[in-house]
């Protein structure tokens, strides 16, 4: 299962041609199981200019698996943040720590374009999709 992060979805939905978008297209064509968190959906929907665009995004995400943070996810997210900080990496968004925690707990690879996930991988063993 692959968790696709917000930045990649933004480029995908905008029709941009990037290596990350090409990989999402391949994942969809290969019928790979794709997941997301509510935080990712929220970030995408809050960037919409109107309710119709937000609803369109919701509909696009219906076939994917939503990962729900558990109590343990929040604890792990806090630990991820602390562990990264101890190693000299300040994660810019605690949301990224929560997304990483959900991915770790659900044994997902993360497909991203955000440097914070590289730091989390280095310190905490987050699985990053590479193809």
Predicted regions and their residues:
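Acidic, PIN/NYN-like endoribonuclease modules and their adjacent C-terminal/linker elements
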Residues: 1, 100, 104-131
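Short, well-structured N-terminal submotif of metal-dependent ribonuclease cores
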Residues: 1-36, 46-59
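Histidine- and aromatic-rich ligand-binding microenvironments
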Residues: 5, 37, 92-93, 114, ...
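Generic structural signal for small/hydrophobic residues in well-ordered secondary structure
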Residues: 5-6, 44, 77, 103
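A generic structural signal for short hydrophobic patches within well-formed alpha-helices
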Residues: 9-10, 41-44, 117
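A general structural signal for well-ordered alpha-helical segments in protein cores
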Residues: 21, 37, 41, 54-57, ...
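Short, hinge-like loop/turn segments at secondary-structure boundaries
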Residues: 51-55, 84-85, 127-131
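Active-site neighborhoods of divalent-metal-dependent phosphate/nucleic-acid chemistry enzymes
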Residues: 66-111
């Amino acid at each position: 299962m692959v968790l696709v992060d917000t930045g990649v979805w933004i480029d995908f939905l905008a029709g941009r041609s990037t290596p990350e978008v090409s990989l999402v297209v391949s994942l969809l064509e290969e019928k790979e199981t794709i997941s997301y968190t509510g935080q990712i959906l929220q970030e995408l929907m809050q960037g919409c200019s109107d309710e119709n665009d937000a609803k369109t995004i919701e509909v696009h995400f219906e076939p994917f698996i939503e990962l729900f943070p558990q109590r343990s996810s929040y604890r792990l997210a806090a630990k991820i943040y602390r562990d990264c900080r101890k190693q000299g990496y300040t994660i810019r968004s605690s949301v990224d720590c929560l997304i990483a925690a959900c991915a770790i707990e659900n044994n997902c690879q993360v497909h991203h374009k955000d440097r914070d996930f590289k730091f989390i991988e280095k310190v905490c063993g987050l699985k990053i999709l590479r193809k």
